[in-house]
Structure formats: structure tokens, C-alpha cells
Amino acid sequence: MKKSLKILLTSVGCPGAPAMIRRLKNNGEREITFVGIDMNPYATGFNMVDHPYIVPPANDKDYIPSLLAVIEKEQPDVLFPQSSSEVGPISRNKQKIESLDVAVMVSKPEPIEMCNNKYNMFEFLKSNGLETPEYYFPKNLDEFQECAKLLGFPNRKVCFKPHVSKGSRGFRIIDPRIDKVDLLMNQLPFNRFIQMNEFVEMFQNIDLPQFLLMEYLEGPECTVDTLVSNGETLLATVKTREKARSGLAMIFKTLNRPDLESYSERAMKELGLDYCINVQFKGEHLIEINPRVSTFTYQDDLVLPYLSLKWLLGEITKEELAAYKSRIQYGRITIRYYEQYGVKDLHVPHIIRNK
């Protein structure tokens, strides 16, 4: 057996946390104990970790001091962040965290900031010769409507999202052909459609936020999950997003898509990212790069986050990682489902804040 590990896992209430915790614990090589943090006292992962703590949100001034307090108390071997909102603050404070003798699985601050701003990311990739969807940055309502016409509206659908957002917050599709009665009676209440007149009315008397306005892309949604070291892709897998519920992907299929992997490799090289990176495509086009872990499709003999830990700790070579490519089971279906648990008395973890 290899030396045991203590991992500090952030955002243990995120959708992918339960499966990751189970897979990392059942790695077959070593014992792993978990320190889990989240801002939500009802975070699902609190029931699965060994040492749970509530911390402030990542944008709170007390987040990093609270994180450092947990580290000083628990002395983990590795800090493994999961949320987009956390990787930036953690990366900017990486030196301070590492001074407490903990390895940090996070990219450098500059590429993280680039990826977390959708417009800046597209501008950077385009300037380095990578293909992007057609997009604009309108500064006011008039420009927004004019840019929509340049994208083919109203004959073609367009979509927009904030430059900086998390998940699908702020994303909408503008389609003049949508039927409001159909949306009301037949569609789920969290649909993403809006009409142009509704958008104009919404921002008629207030400043227009920073939106990325872009062509609406057709085709299947695919994700490349990568393990990267200073921009070099060491291992990658591709999955589809077959079905979703409440905006959350529930069914995936593992695919052999060398074209998407090739694009992802070029983007990783230009950005200089590290560790687990999630690259999203719609059809043939890039739509997003998340500088963090995503929902993985696991195999018993291929657990990407565990391999990432081994790379971080210097326990595996590039050649050994590359050999895992032959293990990928193309066509494999992964199904996510809801689980529940009950407790007689809710155990509220410790709250550590800056004093």
C-alpha cells in the first residue's frame, strides 16, 4: 500500500462531489481521508468526508483566512479545489497556502482569470489562431440589436451570456419563433429562451451588463476532460451530454473525438493551464473552458482525478499517464442519479472564520 493521504476538498456540496469522493476513497492503492469544506451547511458531501467545515463564500474577505485556518488545524497533504469561484482566490494565494506544507492542485492566476472571462478567453484564443464562434461585445442596447442582426437575427437564433458567470447563470437564447403558450404549457419552467423585445424592455432604463453576444450553435454538446501540466495535455477523455435535468447533465457517453482533443490540446498550450481542466464544445465549436474539475465519467481502471493527484505528488510519469489512453472504453454510458440520506440530528460542521 502507498502512503496514506489527507485531502482537503472544497465545494463538497457540488453535484460531482459524491462520486469523486467515493472513487478516490476506493482507489485500491492507499487510504485517503477527506477534509471537506463548503459554505452550505446542508452540503451533500459533508456526510461523506471525515472532517467537515463550513467556510464563507469564495468572494468573501474571510474565505482565504478561513481556508488557512482549516489547513493549519487539519494539516492536509493536498488542497483540491472544485469550484470556478474558488480556483482564482486559491491560485492567487497559492504561495501562502504552500508555506503550510500542502500541495495545491490549481493553475496559475493569469490563465484562470482569462478562462473565467468568456469574452477575454475568446479574444485570446482567436488572436493565437484558434477558431471561435462568431461573437460581439455590445456596449449598449442599440449595439446589442445591431450586432444581433450581424449574426443573422431574426432569421437565425442568437444567444448571450455574461462575460463572467458560473454555470448557466445569465445565459439565454433569443429566438423570435418561440411560442410563449408552448413555453408555459409544455416546457419546464427553467427554459433558456427569451424574445428580443423582452430583452430590450429589461434593460431599457439601466446600463447594459457586459454580455458576450454570439451565434447560436447547433449540434451535440461534448466535453473534453483533461489532465494538463504547464499547458501540455497528458491525458484526455471526451464525453457527450446526452440528457440533462434542471440544467445538470445526467447521462453521458464516452466518445473517440480526436478533433476535439486536438483543439483542446492547442488551447491548453496557449493558455498554459495545469491539472484538471474542462473544455466544452457545441457541435464543432468551443463554448467554454473551465479551469477546474468537472463531472467525470469514471471507469474502475481509469479515475482521472486520482491520476491527477499522483501527477501532483510525482508518483506517475508522462509515459505512464499516456498508457491509460488505451483503457478508455469508447461508447460507455454513464448515468447520474439522485440519492438521499437522512440523519436524526443534523450535524452542523464547525464554522471557522477570520478573527
Which residue ranges define each predicted feature?
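Active-site nucleotide/adenylate-binding loops and adjacent lid/helix of ATP-dependent enzymes
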Residues: 112-210
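ATP-dependent carboxylate activation and anion-phosphoryl transfer catalytic cores
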Residues: 5, 11, 74, 242-247, ...
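ATP-binding N-terminal substructure of ATP-dependent carboxylate-amine bond-forming enzymes
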Residues: 1-106, 145
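Residues that mark the start of a beta-strand
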Residues: 4-8, 157, 212
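Preference for protein termini
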Residues: 1-37, 72-82, 137, 182-186, ...
